[in-house]
Amino acid sequence: ASPFGLNKNAGKAGPPTRWLGGDAYQTNISEFDKGIEDSGIGKFQYILFDDCNMTGIEVAYELRNATHHIIGSPTEIMAYGMPYKLLWNELSKVNPDYHSICTNFINFYSNYKYGNTPYPYGTISVIDCSQVEGMVNIMKEINASSSLSIVVESDIQSMDGYVPSIFYDMGDYVRKL
């Protein structure tokens, strides 16, 4: 969900951290969740996002009842996107090996080149949505017992290239409390 290239009507889909898609087609994450629920098809085994910044706790919380797992990038994803050809063997299984999916993704991007220029960058995350409620409860306890005033935003690892940052590493946030 990138705020770059927003047009004057983009805010209609919600804040830039609450939707997926580009200028032409945007879907609010809560509406996406409701659409899955309303379809009656039940819970997905996984949802794979080939989009930037889609494995934050906010997305996982919103989709916790729609899917068992979320696969995606917690940061910006390279323009090439997901290397589906390498991932398909696992993605097509009833019970994918999520560790293997991550390993194949990392191996691909460790050797990725655009033209002759190496771009060995890529981040992937798999979230087990059955653990999201527990994480939310832990974070409530941590936030209630900590002085948030001591946290210096610029000291927390940013997960994006925006100025100012809008996505942060939750683990680093907790370590800085």
Regions found by a protein language model. Give the residues of each.
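Short beta-strand segments
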Residues: 1
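Terminal, contiguous helix-loop blocks that mediate binding/assembly
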Residues: 5-177
